[in-house]
Amino acid sequence: SKVENIVDELKTLTL
């Protein structure tokens, strides 16, 4: 994933 979407991906992982 890109740095601009890392926050979104982290949120999806920490459901």
Curated annotation (Swiss-Prot):
Function statement: Forms part of the ribosomal stalk which helps the ribosome interact with GTP-bound translation factors. Is thus essential for accurate translation.
Protein name: Large ribosomal subunit protein bL12c
Superkingdom, taxonomy of origin: Eukaryota
Induction line: Expression shows a diurnal pattern of oscillation across the 24-hour light-dark, with increased levels during the dark period (at protein level).
Quaternary state and interactors: Homodimer. Part of the ribosomal stalk of the 50S ribosomal subunit. Forms a multimeric L10(L12)X complex, where L10 forms an elongated spine to which 2 to 4 L12 dimers bind in a sequential fashion. Binds GTP-bound translation factors.
Keyword check for Chloroplast: yes
Family membership noted in the UniProt record: Belongs to the bacterial ribosomal protein bL12 family.
Keyword set, alphabetical order: Chloroplast, Plastid, Ribonucleoprotein, Ribosomal protein
Subcellular compartments: Plastid; Plastid, Chloroplast
Species per Swiss-Prot/TrEMBL record: Chattonella marina var. antiqua (Red tide flagellate)
CC per GO annotation: chloroplast; ribonucleoprotein complex; ribosome
Annotated S-S bridges: none
